[in-house]
Structure formats: C-alpha cells, structure tokens
Amino acid sequence: MVWRNGRRAELVTNAAQYARGYDPATGKELWRLAKKSEVTIPMPVVGPDLVYITSGNRPIQPIFAVRPGVTGDISLQASEEHNAHIAWSKMRGGPYMTTPIAYGEYLYVCSNAGILTCYAADTGKEVYKERLGGVSYTASPLAADGRLYFTSEQGEVRVVKAGPQFELLAVNELGDVCMATPAISGRTLFVRSQHFLFALGRKQPAE
C-alpha cells in the first residue's frame, strides 16, 4: 500500500514479524516495526495523519498507529505504548482476517466473531465496543456516505452508522456464504458470495 502523507510517499507492507516502509521509487527500506506476531493478514490502513498496522494472531494481537516520515527501527520497547514514531498502540484487539477501516475521526476494527470496536483515530481511546451479530467475519468492511458495511460469512450485510455511537441501520440477508470483500462503484455495493454476485443499491426509475 502506498501512503502519500504530508512528508513523502511510503510503500507500507504488513508481514510476519515486521511491518516495513519503503521508498517506492528506489525500494530502500525507510523504517521497520517489530510486531511480535507470526501471522499477518490485514492490510495497512491509512488515516488522515497516521497509518495503522494490525495483526490478530494470538497471543499478540497488536494495533500500531505509525506517524509519517519516520526512519529506522521504530519498534516499541517492552514497557512502551508509544514513542516518537508511534502515536499509540494496543497489544490486544487486532483483527485476524479483516482489514480495519479508518473513516473520519475513527478507526473501526471488526473481529472474526463480529465484535466491532471503535477507537479515536488520533489517540487510540476506545469509543465503543459492540457485538454486530452473525457468527463469523472474513470479508473486510467498507465505508461510504457515512455508513459502514460488514459482511458475515453467513451472508448478512450489516449497515452501521459511522460516528462515536453504535447504531445498526439495516441487516440485508443474502442467503449464501460470503467470504470475499465487497466493492463499491458509484452508489452500488457489489457482494460476491459462493454462488452469486449481488448488486445492492437503490433501483433507478425507468426513463
């Protein structure tokens, strides 16, 4: 993922043991962050001022908020929760499969079991933690027009209002297994299930 921040462009990778930032023009390593996590699936996530690195492999399930323009080994020491390079961190709560969403002033993290945690994006303060419903989540969520979309493996698309208070707006039942991350084009949400491709949106009036 290329992060174009106010200082430079950084190619950010999230891998086992380390996350790294590279100069995309030369491939030179700019920084590295020890995560102490053997398995990493989620992508890095860009917010307004920080990039978020997560992993949900037990026993360590970290979330790191990395500042732009850092250089060298930016790893936290054993007793640290932040340093000059990392704005904040959590050693529990990182997702195993799903990539979080940085949307507006908040970072939203959904666990495999459907526990949605909302953090203040700049400080890491927990704003709320709520159960979405559904059994399991593999697909990463999406955000658009002030709404968050979470697709369970059981084929239920849950729509949550973005913001500091949890509000479930709708549940759309598709009736088929869903594991792929949906995509948004225009005002249509496309969801690929095991047997079908769904296009969800408002029906346009006939001309």
Identify what each model region corresponds to.
Residues M1-E207:
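Noncatalytic, solvent-exposed loop/strand surfaces
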